[in-house]
Regions:
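Short, small-residue-biased leader/transition segments that mark boundaries at the very start
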Residues: 1-4
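Extracellular/luminal recognition modules and glycoprotein regions
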Residues: 9-49, 56, 62-67, 161-177
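A short linear-motif detector with a strong N-terminal bias
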Residues: 14-16, 31-33, 83-86, 121-125, ...
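A residue-identity detector for tryptophan
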Residues: 17-20, 51, 69, 87, ...
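Residue-level detector of short, conserved catalytic/binding motifs and their immediate flanks
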Residues: 49-51, 143
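Active-site-proximal beta-strand/loop segments in catalytic clefts of secreted hydrolases
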Residues: 54-56, 148
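Mid-length scaffold segments of soluble, non-membrane domains
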Residues: 59-127
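Beta-strand-rich cores of mature extracytoplasmic or soluble domains
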Residues: 105-185
Length: 185
């Protein structure tokens, strides 16, 4: 409905804005009942469906902390199930994710860009190299599959321009499938 699409009035530092921005990274039938967590771990809204929404920006804080994220795209929110967040926890702490089941996560607001080959490239030199190599992708709306066994993605394309689902971080323990949806390109 309208609440799903309409940005709330007020500052981007408010709980209301963050709940809207983070939860709308998934379709409304998931976002309406998901838990929403702030970047500091504070639960902004308790959910009931087993899905969680939070900012996925690896910088952890807005470029303008006083005024909050510029928009949902800068926040890079992700709405994922428990297995997706177990994967994300491993990813962010540099440990190997251990899941018995595949994880799923939505990022309908896209992201600010990634080196498709190597994770957590955030320095200017690394970004410039990825761009020069044609491996920098600023993703639009997508769904992600975090396989319990990343080797199940072996042989899938890594070509993010093909329009087909593609593997990001191929050959690493963090390999996952990016599934573009309408608005990706």
């Amino acid at each position: 409905g309208d609440v799903y699409k309409r940005q709330p009035e007020g500052p981007h530092t408010s709980a209301e804005w963050k709940i809207w921005a983070y939860s709308t990274a998934a379709p409304s039938f998931i976002s309406a009942e998901c838990t929403v967590v702030d970047t500091d771990g504070t639960i902004l809204r308790e959910g009931t469906n087993g899905w969680t929404a939070m900012s996925g920006n690896p910088n952890g804080a807005p470029s303008d902390p006083e005024n909050g994220w510029k928009d949902p795209h800068e926040a890079m929110p992700m709405v994922g199930d428990a297995a997706a967040f177990a994967w994300a926890q491993g990813f962010m702490t540099g440990t190997v994710p251990k899941n018995d089941v595949d994880g799923w996560a939505w990022m309908l607001h896209g992201d600010m860009g990634e080196d498709n080959r190597m994770y957590l490239v955030t320095d200017e030199e690394g970004i410039a190299k990825a761009k020069a190599d044609g491996e920098w992708i600023e993703s639009g709306a997508h769904l992600m599959l975090f396989p319990a066994d990343p080797s199940t993605l072996d042989g899938q394309t890594t070509d993010f321009n093909s329009g087909a689902p593609y593997v990001m971080f191929s050959g690493t323990e963090y390999a996952h499938l990016m599934i573009p949806v309408e608005g990706y390109y």
